[in-house]
Amino acid sequence: MKSALFTRFFILLPWILIVIIMLDVDTRRPVPPLTPRPYFSPYAVGRGGARLPLRRGGPAHGTQKRNQSRPQPQPEPQLPTIYAITPTYSRPVQKAELTRLANTFRQVAQLHWILVEDAAARSELVSRFLARAGLPSTHLHVPTPRRYKRPGLPRATEQRNAGLAWLRQRHQHQRAQPGVLFFADDDNTYSLELFQEMRTTRKVSVWPVGLVGGRRYERPLVENGKVVGWYTGWRADRPFAIDMAGFAVSLQVILSNPKAVFKRRGSQPGMQESDFLKQITTVEELEPKANNCTKVLVWHTRTEKVNLANEPKYHLDTVKIEV
């Protein structure tokens, strides 16, 4: 009997010693400091979807720590709006011209298109076109008096003035936001780089124009960052020997000069630009753009006159197609 007990004792003895050693080692470990650990709530979501720890000391304590460690982001400056005033009139290539222009404007951020028809009422063609253009736009109309439609007289005067009047009325009772105005005739072609250049206009900015005045280009002559003359094919003695596509005006300048318009009376052919700019600026104040007026970023392309010699006098097709 005793031998059986001794046998069992010696069998259990190693296991008893192992348990005693393990208990002795565990009790000698240093006790970790009782510090609060962050609690990750499934309802607190940070930037990028990451969970944010909620402090045990209370929500106010946690918010204060975050605000101290991370500065508040500053709001970005507002991008100046570009207002493009485009006179247009009914002709076979009208929709084609406007389509090319819209495809350019659609790629320009913060642009508002003011389209002014030379008509007594808004046409269905232009109304449908603007509705599908996907652009912030305003559709105006004003007819040119018959006596001013003779060859050699300035064109689109009433339409440009209607666009100016709309701008002034829009900002009459509110603080004007940063903006830039330019006159975008529908027979021009524009580089997207031009819109980046004109957006920083402080008062009146200028640049070269291609395929105009019987030359490959016309441009302001610049020395030491100032306009000192004009490279032009016609009447370099004009106060501002520049094409309508060659300048932009700050919105604030337009609003500060409410009487500045394009004139009919006393204005000679080819002098519309000079007569308008004389009312709002001087040559010394002009801001050269396009690398000191050495890059052409707009072209007066003009669509070729359409040959419709074979067009039937009466509509013969079974369907009516808008062109």
Curated annotation (Swiss-Prot):
The chain crosses the membrane at residues 3-23. CDD domains: GlcAT-I. Pathway: Protein modification; protein glycosylation. Its EC number is 2.4.1.135. The active site is at 273 (proton donor/acceptor). Gene3D superfamilies: Spore Coat Polysaccharide Biosynthesis Protein SpsA, Chain A. Residues 24-323 are lumenal. It comes from the Eukaryota. It holds the Pfam family Glyco_transf_43. It is found in: Golgi apparatus membrane. UDP-alpha-D-glucuronate binds at residues 87-89, 118, 155, 160, 185-187, 300-302. It catalyses: 3-O-(beta-D-galactosyl-(1->3)-beta-D-galactosyl-(1->4)-beta-D-xylosyl)-L-seryl-[protein] + UDP-alpha-D-glucuronate = 3-O-(beta-D-GlcA-(1->3)-beta-D-Gal-(1->3)-beta-D-Gal-(1->4)-beta-D-Xyl)-L-seryl-[protein] + UDP + H(+). The record marks 218, 310 as: Interaction with galactose moiety of substrate glycoprotein. Its cofactor is Mn(2+). It is an enzyme of class 2 (transferase). Residues 234-243 are annotated as: Interaction with galactose moiety of substrate glycoprotein. One of its GO terms (molecular function) is metal ion binding. Mn(2+) binds at residue 187. Belongs to the glycosyltransferase 43 family. Homodimer. This is Galactosylgalactosylxylosylprotein 3-beta-glucuronosyltransferase 2. It comes from Homo sapiens (Human). The gene is B3GAT2.
